[in-house]
Amino acid sequence: DESLFSTSLITERGLKFLEKYKKGDFSEEEKPFALWISFPDPHEPYEAPKRYTDMFPPEEIKLPPQRAGEFNDDTSPERNKILFEIMGHKSESEDQIRSQISVYQAMCKFIDDGIKEIIEKLEELDLKDNTIIVFTSDHGDFMGEHGMFVKGGVFYDCLVKVPLIIAWNNGDFDQGVKEKSVVSTIDIIPTLLHLQGIGDFNDNGLSLIHI
């Protein structure tokens, strides 16, 4: 039952929150609203509804390139070697790896559709133009790169390069800008305060508006 997946449940709670706000069920002290929607996926257990897994046939998954002996020479940090010993997929077949990547991509698509529903609800309720939308992730995933899955305390691009999207139709900043600067999640709150005309960030993070 697709409705029992956490992605469906969390999306539904978000939609109900917005509908409740629009109906006026919030006191003046509770306005304007702040809604934090956190999807636990894509995490173990790797599962997604069939209509999503069907979108990503395992046999069509392209495996990430591998460097033979990556952790067998002196160029690899010891920490990375230990992580590979713990997490490396040394016994899985290529078909098994493709299947896991397939489900991971299906889970991401499932979340994408949930976010789409929430944005469409904002539009339907005439809330989108004056709502600041922030999309990001706490970390990436090896997902087959460097011969590993999930995550670890190392600084590979696949783990630390995550999206950060800030959108506000009524915002006084350039729209559609793509920036490759390195930033931190600690910068999100100062950015939101800046957008609302609040300038005291207490030196915790930086506003990203003028990057």
PLM region spans:
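Conserved, charge-rich beta-strand/loop surface module that forms ligand/interface-binding patches
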Residues: 206
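Conserved small/polar residues in nucleotide/adenosyl-binding loops
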Residues: 209-211
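Zinc-coordinating Cys/His ligand positions in small cysteine/histidine-rich zinc-finger domains
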Residues: 185, 189
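Active-site periphery "cap/insert" segments of enzyme catalytic domains
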Residues: 16
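Active-site-proximal cap/lid insertion segments
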Residues: 1-10, 19-182, 195-202
